[in-house]
Amino acid sequence: MPRLSTELLIIGGGATGLGIAWDACLRGFKVVLIEQNDIGQGTSGRYHGLLHSGARYAVTAPSLARECAQENAILRRIASAAIEDTGGYFLATPADPLYFPDRWLKACKQASLQVEEVEVAELLRREPRLSPRISRAFRVQDASMDSFDLLHILRRAILEAGGHVLLRHRLVGFIHRGGTLVAAEIEDLMTASPLCISFELAINAGGPWAAHIANFAGVHLPLALGKGTMVAMASRPVHSVLNRCRPPSDGDIIVPVGSVSVLGTTDIPVSDPRDLQIQDHEVDALLAEAEMLLPGITHARALRAWAGIRPLLAPPVDAGARETRSLGRAHAILDHEALDGPGGIISVVGGKLTTFRLMAQECLDVVCERFGRSVQCSTSTTALEPADRRFFALPMRHRRLAHREPGNHASDLICECEFVQQGDIHRALAADPPQTLDDLRRDLRIGMGPCQAGFCAFRTADIMAPVLSQPAQELAAFLHERWKGLRPVAWGKTLQQMEFIRRLYAELLGFSQPPSGSR
């Protein structure tokens, strides 16, 4: 069996795990991170795209609100390439409690958050699609953040700092010695071959899988899982983040991300981190709540729906049974040896994507204490440099295309929706070969535009054929995965396009496995 040795083994490749690995590398630790899927395939890649100002938590969790505000400012400095400074508003509608805006505003001031009440008439001039029935409006420091971009630059920073990131490597067990974990048994999911990694300390950053990972160590981790459903609209009628000024509840936010608007979110307790099934009533509720802010949005085209799992630390008696909306979003760092568990493992649970850097800093402070090292955190002042091929915001692509030499470049365009060209794909394949079409989607946004892979998928599969073991099966899997998000919003123009794409693949291209409406 192949063997590796490291100081820190980090389990989980979401924002938390990658942030911990980055901080650890900068502090001089030898680091190996394992992730059972691709970067961005878990909770961090399944959120609504909001960089929190902290205002959402001013009433319910003031300390978390302050943390979000602090980290918001830091991330704007160190990861600006992944952030669009949209700004945001908290808005009071006729359906919201009259008492809440004043209570919320007082809490924001007590938490030292930047909040400014603005005239509704002024806001309507800026955002004319908003409901004229809004009674009060408050400007906050919200922004939108592309988590795929963020995760990729984190991974790049880890590799450049000397760390190792092993994708599609799954933990299957720990090796104990005298009550302390000393090694991990790993399976390479691409080759089905085993790997043993010895370590001095393991850090469990598995998100919704953290309890499962802890079980391998003989530790019960009381996690409550909350499923949140989101709907992406195929247009961007507003340019700022919109929040309902009311106690946190379902459907209280609209986030403009790239060329779409994301309606979010629901919060339903689940027991399995794989339970991502979207219910019709969730989609209906999100659209109905969005209508309160943007009249007519229910008649606009819904692009797709998806769900993510929030891992929340709960009191042991409540884990898995309590309504997850009422549970706190703060993070916790659990040294299991100090809690009468085995040595050699720490778990990091809870938190927000906005606070991932702070979570990593606090975790590494604990690690440094364990190792007897005195090395200060430097991530708050270290810029995360983007790889040129990674960032594909539409305005950037438009500018690049506008400055190209004259000529016929139509054949270069693979994805018309997201303006991805052949060269983009070839550069991605040369730099870091994706294993699947879905990997390339997270890299370049292939298949994420209005056609939802209808026209770009077969072109991309043709280019990737040399690196795909079974191109036809991979294309079928990619299309079916895209259609999972289309089915919950399959009405009107979306339903028409689904039928058009089905017939395109089945009748024109003669594809033996066209997407279908079956579940």
Residue ranges and their predicted role:
Residues 147, 221-229, 236-237, 241, ...:
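C-terminal catalytic lobe of FAD-dependent flavoproteins
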Residues 391-401, 407-410, 462-519:
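Intrinsic disorder at enzyme termini
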